[in-house]
């Protein structure tokens, strides 16, 4: 059995035990003109929406994460990325400047309206790249009997990758959506997906995942 066959055998999605995780599809990353705008993330909204519809139809768990910077929890990300720090009134905003990006209490901290959560769906506020670190995500998934995760969202090389690694280290079977994740640079997108394929999980298209789940 080669590596691809081993991954497929171990990680194939399981009926009733699979959840969709939408990572950081927030206005701070998708709204035009935001300091931390990721334009390619707007191109994956339709694929994520299709998967949301499918998971909801199948009554499978759906989870959203929102990266939130708080002045009460001044984590290292705020030092590495000044855009998260509060913008002074009237001061120019933009890349490399304090811009209140993903700052608690700001409108841009929330998931874009097109992908809004529905009642009963879990919205996880996180202060680190990894959606499991310092949150109740692991406990919430285990309480729902989840063992397999389908990851979508942005940025592929930062929060999606960190969450994939965090999930795998907690024994979750990870599948990352190739055309349902995005980052700023196509070469980094490809390289990150290759890293995931090599060690952390499967990488499939939204159509492949829909076909797999549609047979249940």
Give the role of each language-model region:
Residues 1-118, 200, 212-216:
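Active-site acidic carboxylates
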Residues 101-150:
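Internal catalytic-core helix/loop-beta-alpha segment
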């Amino acid at each position: 059995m080669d590596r691809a066959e081993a991954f497929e055998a171990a990680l194939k999605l399981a009926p009733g035990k699979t959840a969709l995780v939408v990572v950081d599809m927030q206005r701070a990353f998708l709204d035009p003109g935001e300091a931390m705008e990721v334009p390619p993330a707007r191109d994956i909204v339709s694929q994520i929406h299709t998967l949301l519809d499918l998971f909801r139809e199948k009554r499978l768990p759906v989870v959203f994460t929102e990266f939130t910077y708080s002045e009460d929890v001044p984590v290292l990300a705020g030092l590495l990325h000044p855009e998260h720090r509060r913008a002074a009134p009237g001061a120019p905003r933009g890349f490399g400047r304090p811009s209140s990006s993903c700052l608690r209490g700001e409108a841009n901290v929330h998931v874009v309206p097109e992908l809004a959560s529905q009642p009963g769906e879990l919205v996880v506020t996180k202060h680190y790249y990894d959606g499991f670190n310092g949150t109740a995500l692991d406990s919430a998934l285990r309480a729902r009997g989840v063992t397999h995760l389908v990851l979508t969202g942005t940025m592929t090389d930062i929060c999606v990758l960190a969450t994939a690694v965090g999930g795998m280290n907690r024994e979750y079977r990870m599948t990352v959506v190739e055309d349902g994740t995005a980052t700023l640079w196509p070469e980094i997108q490809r390289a990150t997906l290759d890293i995931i394929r090599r060690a952390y999980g499967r990488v499939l298209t939204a159509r492949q995942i829909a076909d797999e789940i549609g047979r249940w």
